[in-house]
Amino acid sequence: MKAPSDMKHYLQFKDFSAQEYAYLFERAAVIKGKFKRYEKHHPLTDRTLAMIFEKASTRTRVSFEAGMYQLGGSVVHLTTGDSQLGRAEPIEDSAKVISRMVDLVMIRTYEQTKIERFAAHSRVPVINGLTNEFHPCQILADIFTFIEHRGSIQGRTVAWVGDGNNMANTWLQAAELLGFTVHVSTPSGYEVDSRVAGVAAGSHYKVFSDPLEACRGADLITTDVWTSMGYEAENEARKKAFADWCVDAEMMAAARPEALFMHCLPAHRGEEVEADVIDGPQSVVWDEAENRMHVQKALMEYLLLGQVA
């Protein structure tokens, strides 16, 4: 397939402008409304999405696959086990071949450089479904969920409690672009690196050694698993290091009374979050999970059709 001359990829959160995000959030609300009213919405009829998974996933696969079908399109699912990607065939060659047969590619992999190499040789838009460095689709869903429940995120405070991982990196990019503040608290040795996120040191974020202080006055507290996929060998060491970085009722009480709790899932109750928090009244994790599908539908529509009325 051949995309328009103004083709865009979505590899990091900072790939889009604040104006584009404003459109995507509005469009996601419209698309979600149609879904809730059982209205058919098939702008991508006869379009095909290729999903390439080097890292396995539940939510990423279901949200993209169901979303593309709901938009009227079709899906091809590939893993490194049943394709030549990154094995006998160079990534660049795979990109040149696959992008001649489909309209859109989503990749969930380990190294950010791998998806960037693929995109550099693709004739169609490429979406980052997750890498070790960034998770833009998840933060897109998180911010949309916040807007649904509390309005604009501009000027608000988000507390990130846990690992300085791909989620934390993406939150830093989002804060700089959309004008809010992130309080980051990680154990020693697991800090977020602003150079990876590509944001100015201290720009729109503050670092706290005490997770409770990071949560003080926050509008949103969010976290992730202590041991991400690919780091299983470090699991026991991480459990010891992260023991004080479990989001609990005391942290939620330190935040604003109307503060929300989010988690990208899967969650380990009793580790990064207590059960009474994730299953409590301030938690919006199930809306957050569903919204992956709606924002990604808006994203796919935008990448292929541009802004629509």
UniProtKB/Swiss-Prot annotation:
* Alphabetically ordered keywords of this record: Amino-acid biosynthesis, Arginine biosynthesis, Cytoplasm, Transferase
Entry's NCBIfam families?
Answer: orni_carb_tr (TIGR00658), PRK00779.1 (NF001986)
As for family, the record states: Belongs to the aspartate/ornithine carbamoyltransferase superfamily. OTCase family.
| Chain's role | Reversibly catalyzes the transfer of the carbamoyl group from carbamoyl phosphate (CP) to the N(epsilon) atom of ornithine (ORN) to produce L-citrulline.
Q: What reaction is this protein's catalytic activity?
A: carbamoyl phosphate + L-ornithine = L-citrulline + phosphate + H(+)
Question: What's the protein here called?
Answer: Ornithine carbamoyltransferase
Q: Name one GO biological process term.
A: citrulline biosynthetic process
